Design a protein with these regions (language model features):
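A transmembrane-helix-recognition feature enriched in membrane-embedded lipid enzymes
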Residues: 1-61, 112-113
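Soluble catalytic domains of membrane acyltransferases
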Residues: 54-142
Length: 142
């Protein structure tokens, strides 16, 4: 229970204190999108590393050397919990984006960070809109 409280506290404090950082990143994105993406990824990896450690997750990564670094890679996971995202961001070597359910847009600050990290929001109840999201994802991977 203490670990859960620490994780929630860390995430909430990060989201609150990162409000000015989000503004800075939005401005930087207009001038230098690659620098903004790198800084965003670094910050998200940092906080998710803290979340991972606070949660007491032990893990072993195998086969990282087989992931190509010269082209885009699509990872498809069997989503078991939100910790899939924590582990994905903290272990995968290249910039990573996730597809999230559309309802996540309604979570203040978190959704802004998700947009900043190139997450796409999938409307599972509307096949046409869902297909548009998938096609957008394909373009981003190219």
């Amino acid at each position: 229970m203490i670990r859960l409280i620490l994780v929630v506290l860390a995430v909430v404090l990060y989201l609150i204190f990162s409000i000015p950082v989000l503004s800075y990143l939005k401005n930087l994105e207009k001038k230098d999108p690659k620098a903004a993406a790198k800084k965003s990824l670094d910050l998200v990896r940092w906080i998710l590393g803290i979340v991972r450690d606070l949660a007491g997750i032990t893990y072993e990564v195998r086969g990282l050397e087989h992931i190509p670094s010269d082209r885009a890679v699509l990872y498809v996971g069997n989503h078991r919990s939100y910790f899939d995202i924590v582990m994905g961001y903290t272990t995968v070597p290249a910039p990573t984006g996730f597809i999230a359910k559309k309802e996540m847009i309604g979570i203040p600050l978190l959704s802004q960070w998700m947009v900043q990290m190139n997450c796409l929001f999938l409307d599972r109840s509307n096949i046409k809109e869902g297909l548009k999201t998938i096609l957008t994802g394909i373009e981003k991977v190219k």
